[in-house]
Amino acid sequence: MLDIFRGLKNLVKVSHVKTDSIVFRLHYSITVMILMSFSLIITTRQYVGNPIDCVHTKDIPEDVLNTYCWIQSTYTLKSLFLKKQGVSVPYPGIGNSDGDPADKKHYKYYQWVCFCLFFQAILFYTPRWLWKSWEGGKIHALIMDLDIGICSEAEKKQKKKLLLDYLWENLRYHNWWAYRYYVCELLALINVIGQMFLMNRFFDGEFITFGLKVIDYMETDQEDRMDPMIYIFPRMTKCTFFKYGSSGEVEKHDAICILPLNVVNEKIYIFLWFWFILLTFLTLLTLIYRVVIIFSPRMRVYLFRMRFRLVRRDAIEIIVRRSKMGDWFLLYLLGENIDTVIFRDVVQDLANRLGHNQHHRVPGLKGEIQDA
């Protein structure tokens, strides 16, 4: 089991070369690790122990009843959840049925939880896979081990010149590259919101408000409350088994089934609800931040200055005014990866070139906007 988790850690290991934001890494690293770990835990408990154990009569073999109820799903009675346990009912939702089909709440998700968690992990990694493909190793190629900063002066000078030449010759050609990353962040937001609705469908419309109901349950008077965790993840359910009797007539057998995995499922999904809400909030803030960056050159100057204090303000203003948003984004990522002193020199040299060469001015309306 430990070897599996080590392999899982390597799968979602964050590279030392930073090509994305912290919030984006929460999606493809931490969240994928959490979902895969939960999937492995449920899979282990499901296929090593007994995922379902039904109380049966001697007429029905134990393995037959357990297998049937596992495949066909079990149910509880909605009208019995507010009955007092140990007095009116033996357990919430368990008791005699009045024959109303609408009163039955079926639990069809039980055997699919491990697969669903695995599928969710794949969906969370997809934006990362897409950005990795689009990024193409550009940042890793451009930093040329300048993140270490320990090399001879001649080698350092040569690498700085190569980096500066690339930035100069490719200025104004990085917008689509940056927009592709922003699209991946947007996909991450769509994914986490979509997964909330996916889980809501998975649990028959009970997941969207699950966390709110848990909070409300904790604050409600004990006499008037219904545990939403027991309602969605019951430990004990009913199962109806039909078979032919000795006279050839169909016999109906009611069984009580224990669902031990729901003890774990309950904790997993209450955690995931709050985690997904947090991810949604952080990702939404990140996208608002991206929109501000796209439309506000002054904000780009401010953010660059706040992050890289060794770089002179006039150099930053020249670069932002004479380049496009994609160039700013590339420089920002390079600054995250390169030695601070080397990065300061590269930015200053680029600003000097731009100051002495007017032909690199951004033409048209874009240039007027970026001159603001």
Curated annotation (Swiss-Prot):
The keyword Transit peptide does not apply. Residues 43-110, 204-267 are extracellular. GO terms for biological process: cell communication by electrical coupling; gap junction assembly; intercellular transport; jump response; monoatomic ion transmembrane transport; phototransduction; regulation of membrane depolarization; response to light stimulus. Residues 1-21, 132-182, 289-372 are cytoplasmic. It is found in: Cell membrane; Cell junction, Gap junction. Keywords: Behavior, Cell junction, Cell membrane, Gap junction, Ion channel, Ion transport, Membrane, Transmembrane, Transmembrane helix, Transport. It comes from the Eukaryota. The chain crosses the membrane at residues 22-42, 111-131, 183-203, 268-288. One of its GO terms (cellular component) is plasma membrane. Pfam families: Innexin (PF00876). Coiled coil: none annotated. It is a multi-pass membrane protein. The keyword Aminoacyl-tRNA synthetase does not apply. GO terms for molecular function: gap junction channel activity; photoreceptor activity. InterPro entries: Innexin. Structural component of the gap junctions at electrical synapses in distal and mid-depth levels in the lamina. Isoform Lethal forms voltage sensitive intercellular channels through homotypic interactions. Belongs to the pannexin family. This is Innexin shaking-B. It comes from Drosophila melanogaster. The gene is shakB.
